[in-house]
Amino acid sequence: MFGGSFFSSDDDGFSMMSQLRSAFHNNVNQRFDTRYRCYPVAMIPGEERPNVNYGGKVILPPSALEKLSRLNVSYPMLFDFENEAAEKKTHGGVLEFIAEEGRVYLPYWMMTTLSLEPGDLVRVINTDIAQGSYVKLQPQSVNFLDITDHRAVLENALRNFSTLTKSDIFEILYNDQVYQIKVIDVQPDDSRHVVSVVETDLVVDFDPPIGYEESLQKNKQQNIAGVQGTMVTKIGYDELVRQGDSNLMKGTGTKLNGKEVAEVPKINLLDVEKQECPAPLILPLGTYFFGYPYKAPSIEEDSKKDPNLFKFEGAGTSLRASRKTNGTMGKGSSDDPIDIDA
């Protein structure tokens, strides 16, 4: 009953459990660490995909998905991207697994950050990154201020990103214009200075865009120049007119008989004064100004007028001699109608 076969079977069971435990332990400790030849997403066969180029996710080959599945890497899959030759590093996610074997396609801004050229080697390592709660960004151009709703534009753009790394300058596309934005600060912060922006509530703050102070100074100078006056003031037109008027008709006159012309007082034809803007006309509500004082006619003056005063007075004229009737015809009136013979 308790022969050697029983103990042999028990030993096999312990051996199998030990192997499973060892395999699980190895998978937990292992990580995805592979090197690929990198290329910009613009070189992906097929139609252009702006959401890939202006985002923070890469495209890996199908073999990467198989290996990540064996390692039980949890979602979201986040990675370190490292250029070992230049000792530069950034972070991001993965969008699809459709690249050719041995290749990885990166957004152009990510290749610029890592100082990579097409065909260079890049190291890809899976990692865990804490979810972010706060980021501070700085647009790299004052053109970003032309966007009316920054929050909506940025919220839509960050859907194409998985992480944000401090000091990175990423790119977004809006209304066919590319905007560069630098990550100034992230919270929570660690030694890697990176946060995850996947399924998290993120507070976003902005620093003034680069060139904003110069733009304000330029606008201020333009406003000061406008207050000082127009081109007439700038060229000193008033002084030029006075000088020209004083230099007119210089010399002495001579009569035909040789006598000198008596000096006459000079007449200043132009008296140019500095033109200033008229003071604003401030009137009470409901009051109108017609440019001159208005005097309403009095009622007494209208009553003094003679109501029987004839405005038109004269005598009628007939085209032929009319029949004489008894009585005297009144002035300006006729008892007989005007007859016209056919």
UniProtKB/Swiss-Prot annotation:
Keywords: Ubl conjugation pathway. It comes from the Eukaryota. GO terms for molecular function: polyubiquitin modification-dependent protein binding; SUMO binding. Functions at a post-ubiquitation step in the ubiquitin fusion degradation (UFD) pathway. It is required for vegetative growth. PANTHER family: UBIQUITIN FUSION DEGRADATON PROTEIN 1 (PTHR12555), UBIQUITIN RECOGNITION FACTOR IN ER-ASSOCIATED DEGRADATION PROTEIN 1 (PTHR12555:SF13). Belongs to the UFD1 family. This is Ubiquitin fusion degradation protein 1. It comes from Schizosaccharomyces pombe (strain 972 / ATCC 24843).
